[in-house]
Amino acid sequence: MSKKRSSPNRNVQIADQIQRDLSELIMREVKDPRIGIVTIQSVELTPDYAHAKVYFTALTGNPADTQEALNHAAGHLHNLLFKRLHIHTVPTLHFHYDQTIEKAVAMSRLIDEANATRAKDD
């Protein structure tokens, strides 16, 4: 018997829905003071939907404390998602701080420094 595989498009649709729902649920349902203003940047699902890596940025607060608080609330958020999503398996949530913005700023700074050094040499 062959296993039915979900399409990549369905995976993306479910990840997008989880992203939208988590954004709302964190804002309305999670009362942990360590969680300030959080933006869910992306959600990556495993092919079997068992696990979801949730990438976030934090406008306020310490990112490490926010990550700890979100991972502490992951079980509660999982239960709330279960009530909203109409899928057989709601993934276990794993929150990760998204450092893309900081890395982009650092890279831009390095480029600016290299350009300034080159301008001095000319």
From Swiss-Prot:
One of its GO terms (biological process) is maturation of SSU-rRNA. One of its GO terms (molecular function) is ribosomal small subunit binding. It is found in: Cytoplasm. Keywords: Cytoplasm, Ribosome biogenesis. It holds the Pfam family RBFA. Transmembrane segments: none annotated. One of its GO terms (cellular component) is cytosol. It comes from the Bacteria. One of several proteins that assist in the late maturation steps of the functional core of the 30S ribosomal subunit. Associates with free 30S ribosomal subunits (but not with 30S subunits that are part of 70S ribosomes or polysomes). Required for efficient processing of 16S rRNA. May interact with the 5'-terminal helix region of 16S rRNA. Monomer. Binds 30S ribosomal subunits, but not 50S ribosomal subunits or 70S ribosomes. Belongs to the RbfA family. This is Ribosome-binding factor A. It comes from Burkholderia thailandensis (strain ATCC 700388 / DSM 13276 / CCUG 48851 / CIP 106301 / E264).
